[in-house]
Amino acid sequence: MSEETPASSADAPVPPKKRGVPEGLWLKCPGCGSSVYKKEVEQRLNVCPKCDHHFYVSAKDRIAQVLDEGTFEPMGESLRPVDPLEFSDRRKYADRLVGEQKRTGLTDAAMTGVGMIRARRVAFAVTDSAFIMGSMGSVVGERLTRLIERATDDGLPLIIISASGGGARMHEGILSLMQMAKVSAALARYDESGGLFISVLTNPTMGGVAASFASLGDLVFAEPKALIGFAGPRTIKATIGIELPEGFQTSEFLLEHGYVDRIVTRKNLKSEIARAIDYCGK
């Protein structure tokens, strides 16, 4: 009687592959902690279907959400950031710019231009926190200034949606800080001409952006639960050693204290802007 030959690994039955859920179909909401279907969130303008948390939205998507389809005429696209200080921290600023441009598809942290909102012609700008935290350097400041001057010359309502957690861009030193004054001065001339400036604050709006143009609107709208302020809560506590009220930099707190005029959900933003333009006779 012959001995049995042990089965080789090649002869062993192959267990069926587990059919897992493809990656990227679900998101975890930072507002309520629920797992939510990504496609459903996108259909609701990147808002959680369970708690109405407002997720990040890119500058390009903001344009698609707020402006009438196909009406956006970009301005200042030829302007490109440079590295006049040859700045370097963990990475050379010049290399960082190239990396951010490839990653986001943007040339800098702001998109500006002219478009229509419910058939009303407006000057429109939006910053994007994905590009170096939406910080304001020379190009962002110049694009905004040229847009404001265009709005002044053409008598257009001005809409700026801010999503800037980085404030003035430290990589450009004083050249970025001066943009705060330059943009604010352009807004002062626009105001003297009788223009209507609607500033929309989203999460986050911080630093030099919050301390300049974002706070200068004739009307200041904010998305729900947006973080708005100059320095972050931990920085303030470490600097002055005082425990500040919980949520003191949220849009709801700022509405109660008169800094924000109205909290507007994303789905209502377009209609609220159009209504404000009509109400103000612009």
Question: Which residues are covered by each model-predicted region?
Answer:
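Long, charge-rich boundary regions
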Residues: Y56-G134
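Short cysteine-rich clusters marking metal-coordination/redox-active sites
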Residues: C29-C32, C48-C51
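N-terminal alpha-helical interaction blocks
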Residues: M1-K17
